[in-house]
């Protein structure tokens, strides 16, 4: 259940971070609401996962999910371009997240 909550926390972080891209001052309220709720749910799920998982592992996986997820959305949705070095770095983050999951005792 802790790993499930950690994945949910990562997904909520992605949603909140993408909502930040749409904030343009005071004209649109929905991005601010989505961002606030998203980060709130993300931190709550992360805190619940940290009850069972080591804090360092949980935090590293959470940030990894967020980094890879936001980058993927940027690539697909916003048509952002990446250099080869950035793609390699994201792959290393993914490998680290997978390694932490496979070697975690919880």
Curated annotation (Swiss-Prot):
Transmembrane segments: 3-23, 29-49, 50-70, 82-102
GO MF, one annotated term: transmembrane transporter activity
Sorted UniProt keywords: Cell membrane, Membrane, Transmembrane, Transmembrane helix, Transport
Location in or out of the cell: Cell membrane
Gene3D superfamilies attached to this UniProt entry: 1.10.3730.20
Pfam families in alphabetical order: Multi_Drug_Res
InterPro entries, A to Z: Small_drug/metabolite_transptr, Small_multidrug_res
An annotated GO BP: transmembrane transport
Gene Ontology CC terms, in alphabetical order: plasma membrane
Entry membrane topology: Multi-pass membrane protein
Assigned protein family: Belongs to the drug/metabolite transporter (DMT) superfamily. Small multidrug resistance (SMR) (TC 2.A.7.1) family.
Name by which UniProt lists this protein: Uncharacterized membrane protein YvdR
Source species: Bacillus subtilis (strain 168)
